[in-house]
Amino acid sequence: MERAIKNFLSQESAGGILLMVAVALAMILANSPLAGVYQGFLATEVQLRVGDLDIDKPLLLWINDGLMALFFLLIGLEVKRELLEGALSSVAKASLPSIAAIGGMVFPALFYLAFNYATPETQVGWAIPAATDIAFALGIMALLGNRVPVALKVFLLALAIIDDLGVIVIIALFYSTDLSMTSLVIAAVSIVLMVALNKKGVSSILPYGLLGFILWVAVLKSGVHATLAGVIIAFCIPLRAKDGTSPSEHLEHKLHPWSTFMILPVFAFANAGLSLTNMTLDSFAEPITLGIIMGLLLGKPIGVLLFSYLAVKLKLAELPPGIGWRHIIPVAVMCGIGFTMSVFIASLAFEHSPAAYGDYARLGILTGSLLAALIGYFWLAKVLPETGEKHETH
């Protein structure tokens, strides 16, 4: 189990660095003479047609609806494993990161709404600062090497996974529109068949993959966001087969490199290209921008810390062995690195809004996430010992 966690953390760390490169490249292209080529490439129409089935979308939406469904499939597999056998498999293990994650979602949303109370049309973005980017956060933490206690990394990992689960619920409840009953019925039948396969002990991934594709198309056409299909598929794939092997973990290990080194960097490259042409210092004072920055930079750490502190004081949870509040505080700041998931929610929230809203959101996400990364890194570096020695609680 410890080796699996270390492998996961090392991949996520490398992914965080690759994400930064993808963001930088997108920003350079969006603000260069090649900006038109960059935008035109993302707007390229891509069509999939089989009989009466016709899916015709710009490349950007194929990335956001298709590739990100695979990313959410991976998140679903991780959540299921952690719930059944890992860091969230008991009340004692799950209490602190679960309670901390709730605070880390509630407070950023409140901060955002506080800055957008006078503009109802922008309030739809309340969930944007509620997310934590697991790859970026672990990537920043990894820069400190073995100075970081494994228990602290696992705490951040568990908190971020629960955070992702919360984001999935938010997307399902608040960002699904114009529902098609026919598509929902097809989706329901697909789910029932996958559950039946699970109950029958079918461990081959192929039938789940075929039914999963049907589910993805049905959800895509239903008005519910297509990425949720990935999570549903994950929860239907058995964790343990009759012969003791784990189809779920096998698929998770297969997907991890693709997610880390292809899916998330491609998503970042496609969504982070913020043109600064029309941006001024006044852009930072826009309610959307300010709400997101304050939500990520203040709302996240305040929520995580306050709820963690109350949970410990009320004896609902305990700090991990060898970990003190001086460690938790900078990690709470790092939770404000919301990049990938925040950009994704922003693309849903402002899908039918003026383009400027999306630009302000990306400006807020990039600024807030960068500041959270820098402050969290230097703060954690200051409280950790110079070498990977024994960590004492203070």
From Swiss-Prot:
Cellular component, GO annotation: plasma membrane
Keyword Ion transport: yes
Localisation: Cell inner membrane
InterPro entries in the record: Na/H_antiporter_dom_sf (IPR023171), NhaA (IPR004670)
Family the UniProt entry places it in: Belongs to the NhaA Na(+)/H(+) (TC 2.A.33) antiporter family.
Reactions the enzyme catalyzes: Na(+)(in) + 2 H(+)(out) = Na(+)(out) + 2 H(+)(in)
Organism of origin: Shewanella frigidimarina (strain NCIMB 400)
Domain of life assignment: Bacteria
GO term, biological process aspect, one: regulation of pH
Presence of keyword Transmembrane helix: yes
GO terms assigned for molecular function: sodium:proton antiporter activity
Pfam families, sorted: Na_H_antiport_1
The protein's name in its UniProt record: Na(+)/H(+) antiporter NhaA
Record keywords, A-Z: Antiport, Cell inner membrane, Cell membrane, Ion transport, Membrane, Sodium, Sodium transport, Transmembrane, Transmembrane helix, Transport
PANTHER family in the record: NA(+)_H(+) ANTIPORTER NHAA, SODIUM ION/PROTON ANTIPORTER NHAA-RELATED
Purpose of the protein: Na(+)/H(+) antiporter that extrudes sodium in exchange for external protons.
Membrane topology summary: Multi-pass membrane protein
Bilayer-spanning residue ranges: 17-37, 59-79, 95-115, 124-144, 154-174, 177-197, 213-233, 261-281, 287-307, 328-348, 363-383
Primary localization class, coarse: membrane
